[in-house]
Amino acid sequence: MSPAFHPLRTRVGEAIEQSLFRRTDPVPPPRPSGAVTLRADGIAVTRGGRPVLDDVSVDVRIGEVLVLVGPNGAGKSTLLAALSGDQDVHTGTVHLDDRDLGEWTALEMAQRRAVLPQQNTVGFSFTARQVITMGRSPWARTPRSDDDAVAIAEAMRICDVVAFADRPFTALSGGERARVALARVLAQRTETILLDEPTAALDLGHQETVMRLARSRAEQGTAVVVVLHDLALAAAYADRIVVLEQGRVAANGPPADVLSEELLTRVYGHPVEVIEHPVTGATLVLPRRDQR
């Protein structure tokens, strides 16, 4: 056998190459349910001299779906952006895994939290599959890159995008783009995911699918934060709800404690009725309307 092709030498060479060019697993092992992954403490954000967030404190825990609700302009998306590190805070602190956000690099944050923004734009003509594959880029040259193919295939399947995976992202409908963007976030497989109005462009069936996915991920050990306008979805799927009013936390707790007629009527500036479904017992939040 030629020395150049000796199997032992080949294996030794591969091991050396991996030790030199492949990073070790950059994140700690999974943590128990209830562990805090993100914490905002007394944060404030000001734009144009106007407070957008004012003394907001909230924590994000493994195993929970935390839903942010409130009227337009209440600060929901700004709070999500502050938690993700995409929005600087003027006072207060935000910690990710017990370290200030400013102490993490962009890559380290991408390995710990995945973000779905409101606007899903792609500047080049990538296919849907390529956009989803981008979710795996934080794990390049780490042991977790071995999971790339499985993570991408699973995300495509559960977000129902397989049928148009090879079409250009720019040629997709708004709802299809939203599902592709969500698949990218899920393919990233981080311990925390933050979703800004993930159901906004979706039909009724896909709205339920998205929230079931959020619920399932939480049960599997993920911390999930979702911005929603639909209070019925929030009531059905949230473990905790934070109600924002003019940049401040008006309420923070389980849906049954937070979704009161008095609070919601005040926050939304419109009479609200909170009732129990006669069959399922689910909480329903309805605007009161004049009889026709």
Curated annotation (Swiss-Prot):
Residues annotated as domain ABC transporter: 38-271
Source organism, top-level taxon: Bacteria
An example Gene Ontology molecular-function term: ATP binding
Topology of the protein relative to the lipid bilayer: Peripheral membrane protein
Keyword Transport assigned: yes
PROSITE patterns with a match to the protein in the record: ABC_TRANSPORTER_1, ABC_TRANSPORTER_2, HMUV
UniProt keywords, alphabetically: ATP-binding, Cell membrane, Membrane, Nucleotide-binding, Translocase, Transport
Gene Ontology CC terms, in alphabetical order: plasma membrane
Keyword Transit peptide: no
Binding site residues for ATP: 70-77
Signal peptide: none
Family: Belongs to the ABC transporter superfamily. Heme (hemin) importer (TC 3.A.1.14.5) family.
UniProt-listed NCBIfam families: PRK13548.1
SUBUNIT field: The complex is composed of two ATP-binding proteins (HmuV), two transmembrane proteins (HmuU) and a solute-binding protein (HmuT).
Name this polypeptide is given: Hemin import ATP-binding protein HmuV
Organism the protein comes from: Rhodococcus jostii (strain RHA1)
